[in-house]
Swiss-Prot record:
The record marks 108 as: Important for catalytic activity and substrate specificity. Its cofactor is Mg(2+); Co(2+); Mn(2+); Ni(2+). It is found in: Cytoplasm. GO terms for cellular component: cytoplasm. The keyword Magnesium applies. It comes from Thermotoga maritima (strain ATCC 43589 / DSM 3109 / JCM 10099 / NBRC 100826 / MSB8). This is Pyrophosphate--fructose 6-phosphate 1-phosphotransferase. Non-allosteric. InterPro entries: ATP_PFK, PFKA_PPi_Ttgales, Phosphofructokinase_dom, PKF_sf, PPi-PFK_TM0289. Catalyzes the phosphorylation of D-fructose 6-phosphate, the first committing step of glycolysis. Uses inorganic phosphate (PPi) as phosphoryl donor instead of ATP like common ATP-dependent phosphofructokinases (ATP-PFKs), which renders the reaction reversible, and can thus function both in glycolysis and gluconeogenesis. Consistently, PPi-PFK can replace the enzymes of both the forward (ATP-PFK) and reverse (fructose-bisphosphatase (FBPase)) reactions.
């Protein structure tokens, strides 16, 4: 009887998942394995269910590599939330006859995979294929996580369309961009689309207030107005909400602060662009003016997009590498994560990305001291020190804000500071 390899997907969707499933299935079958697709991540495994699976054939997967979404669906169920659920998961996998397990997911799924591998005590060899459109896993040599490049490509087109609409209708757009703790997607999209301003969580300190974030946006709007323009697009990393005080967020009418099974804030339930829009509108109302702002959130539109060639090529290599590792190539580790380093497949131990202080996966954040960030910032419209140090410019900006020059300088100086 052929040995069994199981595949499951955890976390949010990302372009390229089906390509991984396809390449894993084809390589595994070509090496004599039976491939079992497990539906809905760990959801049914933690309940002991063995019927939510499908035997995959090459015919099932031969053309899915160009499609978005996941034929196995996905879920955020965390099998490592307790000793009982972890043990149940391992026992269910054993009942299914799974000897090899391929997990596809982000940092939470990687953590779950490592715990399953550890609990199985060598009976199930586990390999994790890291994915997230947030690009926040610290892969070697700064390689992107699969799905990121497609997400940036699709989102850039959307933001470019909004920029054209902004110019045509003489209004501002506040665009919240997916990215829990890191601003890679927001910055990449803003830079590629030449958005008026992009703000990301990495540029703010912990506990940043709504007022301080609004100062940055308001400063950009005023400077743009001084240049004769009442239009613009601000790309806003949703992870900024993670930097804010949850109590302040909870006190905003209409905002519900909840956490997911992994303990993260449900950022999708926090309408950051709307919150910032209303706060800026209140400022302008206090000045006796009206400003036209449209709030947009971009995220779900990207996750199941058809992958661009970069992500298809990348994921086929990752899927192939995952199977080769399980069959004994590359490393003798009982489990690990597959990645590409310098064009070559490499297996890293699960703890390679672990933060010893937290016991959780490290997060790759935007390096705000890098040339990449500095270049992006150079092409934004935002207040700079020279604007506030030049008496003539300062006076004009203060007049627009209906403030005294020194009052304006004191309030907005913090927005000119580089992180």
């Amino acid at each position: 009887m052929a040995e069994r390899l199981g595949i499951l997907v955890g976390g949010g969707p990302a372009p390229g998942i089906n390509s991984v499933i396809s390449s894993v299935t084809i390589e595994a079958i070509n090496n004599g394995l039976e491939v079992i697709g497990i539906y809905d991540g760990f959801k049914h495994l933690v309940e002991g269910k063995t019927n939510m699976v499908k035997k995959l054939s090459i015919e099932d997967v031969s053309r899915i590599h160009i499609e978005g979404g996941s034929i196995l669906r996905t879920s955020r169920v965390n099998p490592a939330k307790s000793e009982e659920t972890l043990e149940k998961t391992v026992q269910t996998l054993k009942k299914l006859g799974i000897k090899y397990l391929v997990t596809i997911g982000g940092d939470d799924t990687a953590f779950s995979a490592s715990k399953v591998c550890e609990r199985s005590k060598g009976e199930i060899k586990v390999v994790h294929v890291p994915k997230t459109i947030d690009n926040d896993l610290p892969l070697p040599e700064n390689m992107p996580t699969f799905g990121f490049e497609t997400a940036r490509h699709v989102a850039t087109e959307l933001v470019y369309n909004l920029m054209q609409d902004s110019r045509t209708t003489n209004r501002w757009y506040f665009v919240a961009m997916m990215g829990r703790e890191a601003g890679h997607l927001a910055l990449g999209v803003g830079k590629a689309a030449s958005a008026t301003i992009t703000i990301i969580p990495e540029e703010f300190k912990e506990g940043v207030t709504l007022e301080e974030v609004c100062d940055v946006l308001d400063g950009a709007i005023l400077k743009r107005k001084l240049m004769g323009r009442d239009d613009g697009v601000a790309v806003i990393g949703e992870g900024i909400a993670e930097k804010m005080d949850p109590e302040e967020l909870a006190n905003i009418p209409g905002v519900i602060v909840e956490k997911d099974p992994h303990g993260h804030l449900r950022l999708a339930e926090i309408p950051l662009a709307t919150i910032l829009k209303r706060a800026i509108e209140r400022r302008y109302a206090e000045r006796g003016e009206r400003i036209h702002i449209v709030d947009v959130t971009i995220g779900y539109e990207l996750r199941s997009a058809r992958p661009i060639p970069f992500d298809i090529v990348y994921t086929r290599t990752l899927g192939y590498g995952a199977v080769r590792f399980l069959l004994g190539d590359y490393s003798d580790l009982p489990g690990g994560m597959v990645c590409v380093v310098g064009g070559r497949i490499k297996i890293l131990p699960f703890d390679a990305f672990m933060d010893p202080k937290t016991g959780r996966t490290k997060v790759r954040v935007v390096d705000v001291r890098s040339e990449d960030y500095r270049v992006a910032r150079k092409y934004m419209i935002r207040l700079e020190k020279k604007d506030l140090e030049d008496p003539e410019t300062l006076e004009k900006l203060a007049k627009l804000a209906k403030m005294e020059p020194e009052e304006f300088k004191k309030k907005y100086w913090h927005t000119t500071e580089l992180p």
